[in-house]
Structures are given as structure tokens and as C-alpha cells.
């Protein structure tokens, strides 16, 4: 399943696909969430995190943010099996790993156990990079773009959010 290429252009389709994966508990080893729609990236990140890790589980969760990442530490965490959990989750949020980590990072992703999942959140990515191509081939790329958010899509999304709260417009 991890070799399945799933790249969507519209946020709604991405959310549907992520919801399906969560229901089926069929996760990829690596997720790349990107685009100029930060709210949808944040929502997707939280959906995946909440599905894989229980709230407050600090043993099986580590976050690297704002350009601060050490590949040795990342590798150590990626190869550590989860403790009383099905998954170990590593979040790389705004680290620039797609620009800096290249070969060593690809090696980590290729060899880490199926019990480890990495979520990468970057506003912009170079689609020509080796890391991007590896993730596109072996993981999941969700691209959330403002230009794809039509009025119809946004209205349905708002209606769905309100429906969860038992409200209508």
C-alpha cells in the first residue's frame, strides 16, 4: 500500500482520502502536506496525528519545527519501535528537510520500520528534488492550494463543519 501514489489537487479530495485511510487504519509511512492553504494543512496534520497517537502520548511522538532538525536524532527516533502503541509519529513542521536532508533522509525513510510514520509539513516544496520524488512514489502527497478552493467547495466544507455542530445556515 505504501507504494501507491496518491496525489490530489483539491483539499476536499485530500481530506476524503485521509478520512478513508484513518477509518481503515491503513497509513503510509510518510505524508507530505504542503501548499499555500495553511489551515487545511493544519487540519490534515491534526487528523493524522489524532488517528495515530493518543492525546498526551509523549513516548511515541516527537516534533521538529522551524528549521531545527538533527538527522541523527531523527534516525534514532525513526528506528525506535513504539511503546504500547501501534505507531510512532514524527512531525517535521517547517524544518526545510526537503532542501537539506536529501540522501540521508531518503535512506531513513526507506529503511525505517512500518510502525514509524513521518508527517512533513512545508509551505513550499521543490517537486524536482529527490526527497519529493521519493515521497510521491512511496508515500502520500497532499497539496492544499488556495486557487483550487472554489466557492462551491468552501460552502460544502462550511456546511459540513456546521453539520457536525448540528447547525445550519
Give the role of each language-model region.
Residues 6, 10-169:
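Conserved beta/loop motifs at nucleotide-recognition and modification sites
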Amino acid at each position: 500500500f505504501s507504494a501507491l501514489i496518491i496525489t490530489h489537487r483539491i483539499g476536499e479530495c485530500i481530506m476524503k482520502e485521509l478520512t478513508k485511510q484513518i477509518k481503515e487504519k491503513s497509513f503510509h509511512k510518510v505524508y507530505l502536506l504542503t501548499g499555500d492553504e495553511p489551515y487545511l494543512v493544519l487540519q490534515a496534520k491534526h487528523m493524522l496525528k489524532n488517528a495515530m497517537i493518543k492525546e498526551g502520548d509523549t513516548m511515541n511522538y516527537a516534533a521538529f519545527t522551524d528549521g531545527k532538525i538533527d538527522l541523527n536524532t531523527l534516525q534514532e527516533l525513526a528506528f525506535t519501535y513504539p511503546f504500547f502503541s501501534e505507531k510512532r509519529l514524527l512531525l517535521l513542521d517547517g524544518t526545510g528537510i526537503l532542501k537539506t536532508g536529501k540522501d540521508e533522509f531518503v535512506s531513513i525513510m526507506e529503511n525505517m520500520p512500518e510502525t514509524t510514520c513521518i508527517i512533513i509539513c512545508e509551505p513550499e516544496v521543490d517537486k524536482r528534488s529527490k526527497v519529493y520524488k521519493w515521497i510521491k512514489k512511496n508515500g502520500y502527497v497532499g497539496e492544499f492550494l488556495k486557487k483550487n478552493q472554489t466557492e462551491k467547495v468552501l460552502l460544502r466544507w462550511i456546511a459540513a463543519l456546521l453539520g457536525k455542530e448540528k447547525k445550519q445556515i
